Amino acid sequence: MKIIVKPFHEITTQELYNILQLRSEVFVVEQECIYQDIDGKDQKAIHIFFTENKKTIAYSRIFNEGEYFENPSIGRVVVAKSERGKELGKKVMIEGAKYIKENFTNKNIEISAQKYLKEFYTDLGYEFTGSEYLEDGIPHIRMIKDQSI
């Protein structure tokens, strides 16, 4: 497995195609959520993706503070259905947190988590803040991780 970390302008056309294909497979088709995944924010993001045999198997995108939330954030966390159960979601989140800690001044991470994944994120050190809300028809919660130490 290869771990790739790139800003948008360094992503190849094939890498972008594979990333968007994975996001669409999971967020639009599997979760039956019709929404505009290509939201105009990818250009500002740092993209972390895991590949195997030229296929993207896990992905997330990172934003610096003020680009998405008040704090740096990790979003669009996704793992290919065929690769689940291998802790790739955890690994891609850890890579994102590491990138933020090493490259951004503000070390805290703010995420908009699908509610059913609250325990997954809690196990990674995120704390629930605020109230539940709907995002694209799916219940979400705001969570923050303090990495300032």
Language-model regions: role of each:
Residues 110-112, 122, 127-142:
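Conserved catalytic-core motifs of GNAT/GCN5-like acyltransferases
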Residues 65-74, 84, 103-107, 137-139:
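A conserved beta-turn-beta hairpin within the catalytic core of GNAT-like acetyltransferases
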Residues 1-47, 52-55:
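Short amphipathic alpha-helix that is part of the acyltransferase structural core
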Residues 49, 55-65, 71-73, 78:
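Conserved beta-strand in the GNAT
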Residues 38-43, 66, 134-136:
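A short beta-turn/loop motif at secondary-structure boundaries
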Residues 93, 100-113:
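Conserved GNAT acetyl-CoA-binding A-motif
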Residues 79, 85-98:
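Conserved acetyl-CoA-binding loop-helix of GNAT-fold acetyltransferases
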